[in-house]
């Protein structure tokens, strides 16, 4: 019965294209915490006017009452006109009500659309320990390993070994597409298998996922496929977009469901190709495999109770750290500043590896606590043991982003004779080979 009600509710939302239960932040919460929501939006750099939103929502509620009152009057007149010949006065009243109701309904729809448009741009509230400022204001939390220096650029090295071909990739698909060949392709597979083995041992259930999602799923997860500067490839003429990360289909896995408290947390890991336009990345570190339009990735994802999410955030981070410690990479963990957070995240950690080529830190993986933001966007809830129902919390984290992982290994395990040392933990997945 509950699933049926969810489907009915979803159909109504699809018809109207306005679904207040699917707003990323609850309007009631925004009303009761207007200053906090406005400050958080400002800290994240989102141009949202909460006062305007609440004023429009007041208008919406007033119009809703007017529409309901007019509908009651219409129904009353219809009842009086049944069973006998109606007098002209009732007919005239009915005609006038029809005009007034259509007018009010039109105003209501227009106001609802304005409210919904603003609500979609209200970002999640940040945690109190998130640093203020932009990218340069993110704070180092911890560091691991010793820095190396003096390595050859990963692209020059890989090309010299005959392992990567961007020229032929560009010939068949355009810039930033590539072929991996021989031992480097095998090394990518080795990293994947190693990471998958480790992550599943930590309690994450492995899933393969759709490589496309509908726009509701993408938007509910906090992505904007049709927004300005979007990173997603939208399928023309279809309600579909290619995924930029397995986070998108994993978020949608439990859409419009009510989960049982006893089953949480649910931990998943999804492997998929990722497709990104990489709009707005010019001037950043983009050479070679570091930033491309297509790459493979193993993603971790969690659905949990609100009181579990901070602990699970640390768990996901610890899994990411353990993977790179075992491979043997120097890195640090950064608490990302508010101005560099996306809309869904209340807090995000980045792991940045030490590049011996550039002699600086470069982004490697990230993990985010999105609290109930995505869950509200896709109507994912939990029934408590006392019968109450509320939104779950969701979290995501990169186990390994394969193209970037290869950059890290190519930079850190080169030898003077031109060979590459295979990290010890990867050797069982490379037929026992120590060097390639």
Task: Put a short name on every predicted segment.
Residues 21-145:
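N-terminal alpha-helical targeting/anchoring segments
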Residues 143-436:
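TRNA-recognition modules of translation machinery and tRNA-sensing kinases, especially anticodon-binding
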């Amino acid at each position: 019965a509950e699933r049926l009600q969810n489907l009915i509710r979803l159909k109504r939302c699809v018809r109207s294209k306005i679904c207040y239960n699917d707003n990323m932040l609850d309007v009631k919460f925004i009303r009761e915490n207007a200053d906090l929501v406005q400050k958080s939006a400002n800290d994240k750099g989102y141009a949202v006017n909460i006062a305007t939103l609440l004023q429009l929502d007041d208008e919406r509620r007033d119009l809703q009452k007017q529409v309901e009152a007019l509908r009651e009057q219409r129904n009353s007149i219809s009842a009086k006109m049944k069973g006998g010949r109606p007098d002209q006065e009732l007919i005239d009243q009915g005609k006038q009500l029809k005009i007034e109701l259509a007018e009010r309904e039109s105003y209501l729809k227009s106001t609802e659309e304005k409210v919904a448009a603003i609500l979609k741009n209200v970002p999640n509230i940040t945690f109190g320990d998130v640093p203020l400022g932009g990218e340069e204001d993110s704070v180092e939390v911890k560091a691991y390993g010793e820095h190396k220096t003096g390595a050859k650029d990963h692209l020059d090295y890989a090309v010299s070994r005959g392992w990567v071909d961007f020229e032929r990739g560009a010939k068949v698909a355009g810039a930033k597409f590539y072929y991996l060949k021989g031992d480097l392709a095998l090394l990518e597979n080795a990293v994947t298998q190693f990471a998958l083995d480790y992550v599943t041992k930590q309690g994450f259930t492995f899933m393969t996922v759709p490589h496309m999602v509908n726009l509701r799923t993408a938007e509910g997860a906090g992505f904007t496929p049709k927004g300005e500067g979007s990173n997603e490839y939208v399928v023309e003429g279809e309600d579909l977009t290619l995924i930029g990360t397995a986070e998108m289909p994993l978020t949608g896995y439990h859409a419009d469901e009510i989960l049982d408290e006893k089953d949480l947390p649910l931990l998943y890991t999804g492997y998929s190709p990722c497709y990104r336009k990489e709009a707005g990345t010019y001037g950043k570190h983009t050479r070679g495999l570091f930033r491309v339009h297509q790459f493979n990735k193993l993603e971790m994802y969690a659905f949990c109770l609100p009181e579990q999410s901070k602990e699970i955030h640390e768990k996901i981070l610890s899994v990411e750290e353990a993977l790179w410690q075992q491979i043997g990479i120097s890195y640090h963990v950064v608490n990302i500043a508010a101005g560099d957070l996306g809309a869904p995240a209340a807090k995000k950690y980045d792991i940045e590896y030490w590049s011996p080529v550039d002699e600086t830190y470069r982004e490697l993986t990230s993990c985010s606590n999105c609290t109930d933001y995505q869950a509200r966007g896709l109507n994912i809830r939990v029934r408590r043991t006392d019968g109450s129902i509320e939104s779950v919390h969701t979290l995501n984290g990169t186990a390994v982003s394969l193209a970037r992982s290869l950059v890290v290994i190519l930079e850190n395990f080169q030898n003077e004779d031109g060979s590459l040392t295979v990290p010890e933990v990867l050797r069982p997945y490379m037929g026992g080979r120590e060097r390639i």
